[in-house]
Amino acid sequence: MSQVRLRFAPSPTGYLHVGGARTALFNWLLARKQQGKFILRIEDTDVARSTQESVDAILEGMTWLGLDWDEGPFYQSDNFPLYKEYVEKLIAAGKAYKCYCSAEELEVKREKALKEGGKPKYDGTCRNLPQGADDGRPYVVRFKAPQEGTTYWNDLIKGKISFENAELDDLIIQRTDGTPTYNFVVVIDDATMGVTTVIRGDDHVNNTPRQILLYEALEVPVPQFAHVPMILGADKARLSKRHGATSVMAYRDMGFLPEAMVNYLVRLGWSYGDEEIFSLEDLVQKFSIENVGRSAGVFNPDKLLWLNAHYIKNGDPVRLAGLLIPFLKERGVTDTAGGPELPAVVKTLQERAKTMLELADGALFYYQQELSYDEKGVAKFFNPETPALLRGLFKKLGAVGELTTVAIEGVFKELCEEKGIKLGQVGPAVRLALSGSTASPGIYEMIEVLGLEETGKRLERAIAKLC
């Protein structure tokens, strides 16, 4: 059995969007599962719209998702001489021809066909003209498609799909300026790169019969095709910017983890029983193109958020700490060296944080020298007895050998018993003094992470400011 070869072939006219990322993921997974090759090809024949900035954004997005490639990136713009060579081969074989019809003439033909209730398609005016010198007139090159019979393929997702050849146009494969067209270069690239399986969006279904006819005319193997249903917004319209962020990297900047995005994207159309949580390693073992559904997937931001919260909650604190640094810098924390160890801080927050933004916001107070105190909390939890309670607590904390959460909890119990009070009469005031907020990580965990010295400083600052 020959090696499977799959490719992802984005156009560099923008960022890596969610739909493109899912297509790349499906191709990558099948290549990895079948121990094949995953090829990255940049389809930049639209020179006017293609930018290096977009190329960089696509590569960055794939790298962030963990989708490495075995070959490439290849650029179609490097292959214009090759495409020209194949155009000339088809003309010489009588399988393509020069068409001299002007845009105005074609528009007249189109309007006539519509008026007569027919399907607008080229009427073949130049199909059988002698293919000698073109005497300087502008022309396009058209593929001479068969006019009879049926073109079909067994789609790996959608099943058998067929088109009557009489319905297909004589496809333009080279424009008047000599540049090749999309449907033609895709076939040449896939053929010369030995691509065996093409997984792409189902907006390409109508291109497929035309491309199959080109493969056959070139006498090269036709790959297998799998057309993935599109992704819809909540209103069941095609996912677009009006539904929110569609760029993969925008989700990174919003505090989503790559493993959450990968997990979510693969479940947009693919299933494996009732399982919801998959690592990339799991997916390589379990993924199959046959289990991709035929119905469109609806993008659900809440489900993505749920997955992200799961991965933060169960993530390695050291890794999360490294990912957190850029978000802290955005919030003015440029150096965490003077504060508590960041992985320890993460441990106190990851249980509740849904995004890295929430994690960063929650971590901020650990590294602030001057806190802003919640006014309602101060009015509710600070009173004339508070200074004595806070100082009494600190004195007892100082007598503990090692500040562990268990030891700290014991100190609070001892203080409450000694003063004849409940935890609710001292705990909220301590929380406010240490974090400035009525909502924070657990009090015992906070004290353990801040350490005795910093805890004492914060208690005294709060007493000085609030009592």
Swiss-Prot record:
GO terms for biological process: glutamyl-tRNA aminoacylation. The keyword Protein biosynthesis applies. It catalyses: tRNA(Glu) + L-glutamate + ATP = L-glutamyl-tRNA(Glu) + AMP + diphosphate. GO terms for cellular component: cytosol. A motif ('KMSKS' region) lies at residues 238-242. Keywords: Aminoacyl-tRNA synthetase, ATP-binding, Cytoplasm, Ligase, Nucleotide-binding, Protein biosynthesis. A motif ('HIGH' region) lies at residues 10-20. GO terms for molecular function: ATP binding; glutamate-tRNA ligase activity; tRNA binding; zinc ion binding. The keyword Membrane does not apply. ATP binds at K241. Disulfide bonds: none annotated. Gene3D superfamilies: 1.10.10.350, HUPs. It is found in: Cytoplasm. Its EC number is 6.1.1.17. Pfam families: Anticodon_2, tRNA-synt_1c. Belongs to the class-I aminoacyl-tRNA synthetase family. Glutamate--tRNA ligase type 1 subfamily. Catalyzes the attachment of glutamate to tRNA(Glu) in a two-step reaction: glutamate is first activated by ATP to form Glu-AMP and then transferred to the acceptor end of tRNA(Glu). Monomer. This is Glutamate--tRNA ligase. It comes from Citrifermentans bemidjiense (strain ATCC BAA-1014 / DSM 16622 / JCM 12645 / Bem) (Geobacter bemidjiensis). The lineage of its organism: Bacteria, Pseudomonadati, Thermodesulfobacteriota, Desulfuromonadia, Geobacterales.
